[in-house]
From Swiss-Prot:
PANTHER family: INTEGRAL MEMBRANE PROTEIN OF SOXR-REDUCING COMPLEX, NA(+)-TRANSLOCATING NADH-QUINONE REDUCTASE SUBUNIT E. This is Na(+)-translocating NADH-quinone reductase subunit E. Belongs to the NqrDE/RnfAE family. GO terms for biological process: respiratory electron transport chain; sodium ion transport. Composed of six subunits; NqrA, NqrB, NqrC, NqrD, NqrE and NqrF. NQR complex catalyzes the reduction of ubiquinone-1 to ubiquinol by two successive reactions, coupled with the transport of Na(+) ions from the cytoplasm to the periplasm. NqrA to NqrE are probably involved in the second step, the conversion of ubisemiquinone to ubiquinol. It is found in: Cell inner membrane. The chain crosses the membrane at residues 11-31, 35-55, 77-97, 110-130, 140-160, 176-196. One of its GO terms (molecular function) is oxidoreductase activity, acting on NAD(P)H, quinone or similar compound as acceptor.
Length: 198
């Protein structure tokens, strides 16, 4: 149990997808204007990562890995396309659920919801799972932790962005300029976790 807790904490803080590896920055910067929208997208990323990482772990272990189907047959060259296909299917299902049950959030997320399919944080989580050879339970914990860390980062950035609306930001830095500086400072803060061994 302690191993899984340390893996979760490590994936949220020490190896944060957004602020340590800078993965998923396109949606991270674009949807961080309002806390409510950022929170909704963060929940969507948690759900997709929490399902995509273990689902792809099963596909990799039982289909793609060397000798998984037939001894001596290595289908790992299909990793990239297979993982993207599984992620795309999961995002489509999530999109249909949000459209049916949460239409306001679906409208607020707009084009960024389908872009979760190609969000490199999602694919990065799956790739790290393969590289680190996580088992199924570790994949579930890692997927949920990585999604939680990404959500924590985007909600924190959205909160800071909302507060900066009322501050006197120099004209040349308004918009993405001050956002890049803020993300850099947040990344420096998260870098302080890098020396922690769990």
């Amino acid at each position: 149990m302690e191993h899984y807790l340390s893996l979760f904490v490590k994936s949220v803080f020490i190896e944060n997808m957004a602020l340590s590896f800078f993965l998923g920055m396109c949606t991270f910067l674009a949807v961080s204007k309002k806390v409510s929208t950022a929170f909704g997208l963060g929940i969507a990323v948690i759900v997709v990562l929490g399902i995509a990482v273990p689902a792809n772990q099963l596909v990799y272990t039982h289909v793609l890995k060397d000798g998984a189907l037939v001894e001596g047959v290595d289908l790992s060259f299909l990793n990239f396309i297979t993982f993207i296909g599984v992620i795309a299917a999961l995002v489509q299902i999530l999109e249909m659920i949000l459209d049916k049950f949460f239409p306001a959030l679906y409208s607020a997320l707009g084009i960024f919801l389908p872009l979760i399919t190609v969000n490199c944080a999602i694919f990065g989580g799956v790739s790290f799972m393969v590289q680190r050879e996580y088992n199924f339970t570790e994949s579930v914990v890692y997927g949920l932790g990585a999604g939680t860390g990404w959500m924590l980062a985007i909600v924190a950035l959205a909160g800071l962005t909302e507060k900066m609306k009322y501050s006197d930001v120099p004209a040349g830095l308004r918009g993405l300029g001050i956002t890049f500086i803020t993300v850099g400072l947040m990344a420096l803060g998260f870098m302080s976790f890098s020396g922690i061994q769990l």
